[in-house]
Each structure stands twice: as structure tokens, then as C-alpha cells.
Amino acid sequence: MPMSSSGYSRTTTHFKMMMATKGKRPLRHLTATDKIDAIQRIHDGESKASVARDIGVPESTLRGWCKNEEKLRYMSRQSAENADKLTSEATAAALTAVAAAELFNGPPEKRMKLEQGLFGKKYDESFYKSPRGMNGLDLSGGGDKGLGVSGGDIIMNGLHGADFSAFAKTAAEISAMGKAKDRYGADLSRNGGGDPGKAELSMAAISPLTSLSHLSGMGGLAQSPLALSFNEIATNLNLIAQLNNNHNLATMSNLGGLTAAQSLRNARPKGNASQSPRASLPDSSGSGGGTPGDKSTPSLTVRNLAKLQQKTSSELQNNGRDPNAPVDEALWYWLKSQQAMLGLNNLYSQMPRPSSPQQPQSTPPTTTTTQQQQPQSSTPPTATPPIVSTPQPTPPSSAPSLTPEDTKNSSWFWQWYKTFGASLMPGDKSCNNNSINATNANNSKYENILYSQLTKGQSPPTTADSLNNNAQPINLNISSNGVVDHLKSEPEDLTTTTNPSMLPPEDHTRFNPSPSTSIKSELKPEVDEDEDEDDEVAKCNGANTAVKQVLDNLLYSQSSPGPVATAPSPLSPSSSTHENGHATPTPLADDLKSTCSEDTDLKSSAEAVEHGEKFLKWLEACSDPNVTAMQVMQFKYLLNSIKLSAERQNGGGEERTRRRRK
């Protein structure tokens, strides 16, 4: 029986509906955590088909989840962070904020344009999130939730239950509080101890960061007074603290005692706000010094710091410094951030390491005395640095840890300015004799070479001066009484020629003065003033003097255009013998004669270079502070030049001999 048209149409429609819905499963709303659990089941060995049937999603969808596993894990972490808020705050505003968070985490083209009314809660709840496992802090800024350390999280640097919820005040509250208290951050901590959990903290403690609003995408300060996420700040502080505790990173040995309980934000009490900030111990940061009647004093900020230092220098000279005055934490927080960026944390530790021994108050005389000596009197930090003092870079491993007494009697500004503004030790009553002697020795060690050349004629000749001027073409002939002969008379006549073969053998000593007289006339002010020097050292010094004269004559003979006529010098009675009975080394005079002549002998030049190398070895082992490294290098270059010149002259003499033989 044929089917009617209406019956056929109904059957066709039903068939189409059955075909359209066949194989379709009801859609299930699965969270990111459920998707991650399904992916983990696949990693554990289950097949994609069985997992897809179990959770009720197509297998192709499950394969897409596996491809986007990293994105799903990120969303799962965010949902885990918001789980506590979603369970405790099941209001419409909270649900709207969570929906807004999901929209913001999507692609840019799928984001909704939401009204400002949806953001009644803190903006950085949903926008700036960091995993809790990384820093152990939950500083998400909830309305009634304390920003502290949860029970099972990591306790970092002794930060037990610190409450930072007071930082979440708006700019209007801060300004109102500042007007009520007549000073910026005046009444912050009365109970001492330096514990932020017990103190009333405000944004004044980190006021330098309020100028960083251009770094954030937020429109104004109504959402966060810092214009930054508290999670970001906490993460950065924890990273800095972990670097401080790591002994392998730049040997930052002085920062282990710096606890995050102080959080770089110990509050400033009522007191003299114009006093210089000082790094104080936790047990001494309680009741501040100063009188309560100085509320008219301007606050100590970064901008007017120099004015306040100049204004209070006389007051600090008269009254001294209060050892119990805590540090101005606004500047201290800014300073620590600068030090962290520059890698200078080890120079400005707030407390010594617990394992470091207590060092005595008087600093031992080392080469770093000018930087490690702490000011014990009331010298203002803005004193003019001495010009002659040369700052030395102190290696981090050699910086001694500060004792509590040194920490109480020194301010962070002094340490900062001492490092970057040259050495500021004015030599006051606090500097003992050892530190003054070490400073003088250090200054003489780094003495300016140009200054030593300019003042050479005003001081007795020293080894440093003679070495520094060894490149000058001067033929120094020293007589028996220690007087330079031809320098005091008229200039030497270079036109006359003297034949070395016509000189009698007994006149060789005019080129080589006696070593004994040279020691008495020239080397006595140069050598160390210890009277118990051995005779062997004196003999070596005498030989070195003779070698230096030969080297000077060699240099002068090479730089002069013609043969050299030496000025006669009177013979001393002891010029033929040495102090210990040895004969005067006459080959040195022969060397000089052969060098001045055209027939240069290799033996004479080589012997002079050999003596010069011996003198160089002695000079490198010399511990005289007047001998600088630059002068030793100059002598090395001079000796090398003489050696090369002798080789060239020897090569020329051999060529002339070959030509004569041919």
C-alpha cells in the first residue's frame, strides 16, 4: 500500500532528526583541571578512546586537549588559585570577576569589552597571577584576607605571618593620613622589634615605587597604590632573598643575616626625621631618638636628601648620632633595589652573618682600609673627599662582615657614598695610627707618575724617580762625592771625538764609579731604612747601580747622532776595590767603550742585558711602595729595547766582517 505524501514527509523528517542526532553526546562543561586529569590518564597508559568514552567527549576533542596541554595547565593553575575565593565568596560580583578573568585569558580577538563596574574588586586578582609554589606567598590582595604566609608554604628568611594588607590603601587614604599626621609616614611603629606584622604599615614605606605607574597597564592608583602587582613585588623580593642566601652567586656572604621579616620596610618612628638614616639592628629599631617637638622638620626623601644633609651637618657635629635611630625605610627600600640591580648587595649588608665572628672595633691595616673603616664620630657624610685618596675596588669575597657595633655606628648613605664618591676617610679621631699608616702607604703605592716627575728636583732621588725617568737620554756620571759632573757644568760637547783605544787602561774607572761610593751617595736614600741589611744586599745594590749607569749610557749612545765624549770625573781612592775586597768590575767600562765605538761587541751588550735582567728580577721582588708597577713595566720595555738594539748591532757587525773577508 503506497504511503501518502504527508506520511512520507513525517517519516523523512523523523529520519533526518535521527540521523542528525545520531552519535552526538550531550555536551559537558569540563574545567581545566578535569581536562588536565584526562591528559594525565593518557600519559599513565590509558588509550584516548577509553578516556574519551569515560568522560563523555569525542576522541578528537581529547586529542586537541593533548596538543594544548601547556595552556590547559596554565588555566588550571589560575583556577586553583581562585578556588578559595570562589568557595568563600559565592556572590554575583565574585562570579562576574571570575568570568572576566576567563575572558582576559582568551585570545585578544575574543575578549569582551566590559564596563568598569565589573572591576569593583582588586584588578590584580585576575590579571597578575604567579604560581604559589614559586614564592610561598599569597599576596593577591583579597578584601578581607590577610596577605601573609599560609601554613604549608615555604617560610622564607624568617618571614612568619607578615601582614601586608595595609599596603592596599588607596592614594586618597594615604594623603588623608599624611595630612592628619603632619608628616609623611610619621607614626608608623611604636612597639619596636621591626616586625611588619606588628607595625602599622602604609604606602609611605615604599614611596619611591609610586613613581612607577607608567610601567603598568592600569589607569590610575585607585586599584593598586603601587600601580604594580603585589605578587610581582613579592616574587622579586623572594628572588633577591634567595640570591642573598646563595653562597655560590658572587660570594654574597654578608646578606645571610638580612631577614625578610624586616622586609626592607622597617617603619620609621616618631623622631628626628632629618637625622641621617642608619642601618639598625632589629632589637634597636624600637623607640626612636629625637625630641617630639621637631615635627616642623621636613621629611627625608630622595629629592631633598642633599639639602637635609647640609642643613644638619652642624647639628650632627655637636650632638652626635643616636645609635638607636632606625633607618628611613623609604630610602632604604629604594637603595636595596638599586644595590640588587647593580650587584652590590655584599657591600651593604644590614646585619652580619650569625656564623661570622665578632671582629674588633679597630680595623686591621689592610689595603682596603679606606673602604672598610667605619666612621665612629659625628663626621657628616657630605664631607669633601680628599683628592689624593684613590678608591680601590674591593672584591666581594674579601669584604669583612660588619659587626653589630659597626652597623649601629654607620649609615647606609655613608657606605653608598664612600664607594661611589671616592674614599671619605677624613682622618678624624676614629682613625687609629695603623689605619692612617695603611692609608699613607696605599696613597704612595698609587702615586701619580706625572706628579713624581714634576717634583723630582724638589726631593732626594729615589728608585722610583730613577726608574720613571730612565728613558731620558742623560749620561749620569757620578763622582766619588756623589755629585753629578756634567749636568751642573756646561752642556756636553758632542762634536769632539775620543778614540777608545788611546785611553790608558787605568782610566777605565771614569766610566764606572766605585760601587761603594755609589752606595753612599745615591743608594742610601733609596734602599729600605732597616739598619740590619746584609752586606750581600748592599753589594747587590752597588752592582745594580753600576748596571743602571751602563744601561743609561747605552741608551744615550744609541740616541745620540755621533760618538760620545764623556766628561772626565775625578777618581776616588776606593774606586778600584769593593767594600768586601773584590775588584771593581772593569768589563762594564769596556762594555761602555765598545758600545760607544763603531765595533760593537756582542759580549759587552749581552753582559749589560744580563745584569739588567738580574736587576729587573730584584726590582720585581722589591717591596718598596715608591716603586710602582708602571715604572717596572717601563724598565722592562727599556731592557727589551736595549736587547733588540744589541742584536741588531751584532748583526750589522757580522755583516761588516763578512764583507771584509770577501
From Swiss-Prot:
Chain residue ranges for the region called Disordered: 265-299, 348-407, 491-537, 558-596
Gene3D superfamilies membership: Winged helix-like DNA-binding domain superfamily/Winged helix DNA-binding domain
Biased composition (Low complexity): 349-391
Compositional bias (Acidic residues): 527-536
GO molecular function: DNA binding; DNA-binding transcription factor activity
Pfam families reported for this sequence: CENP-B_N
Main localization of the protein described in the UniProt heading: nucleus
The organism's place on the tree of life at top rank: Eukaryota
Annotated compartments: Nucleus
Transmembrane parts of this sequence: none
The UniProt record lists the keyword Nucleus: yes
InterPro entries: Homeodomain-like_sf (IPR009057), HTH_Psq (IPR007889), RD_transcriptional_regulator (IPR051839), WH-like_DNA-bd_sf (IPR036388)
One GO BP annotation of this record: regulation of DNA-templated transcription
Domain HTH psq-type: 21-72
DNA-binding positions: 48-68
SUPFAM superfamilies: Homeodomain-like
Biased composition (Polar residues): 511-520
Keywords linked to the UniProt accession: Developmental protein, DNA-binding, Nucleus, Phosphoprotein, Transcription, Transcription regulation
UniProt GO cellular component terms: nucleus
Keyword DNA-binding: yes
Job of this protein: Probable transcription factor with a role in the retinal determination (RD) network. Contributes to differentiation of antenna-specific characteristics.
Subunit architecture: Homomers. Interacts with itself, danr, ey and dac to form a complex (or complexes) containing the RD factors.
Name of the molecule in the record: Protein distal antenna
Designated gene of the protein: dan
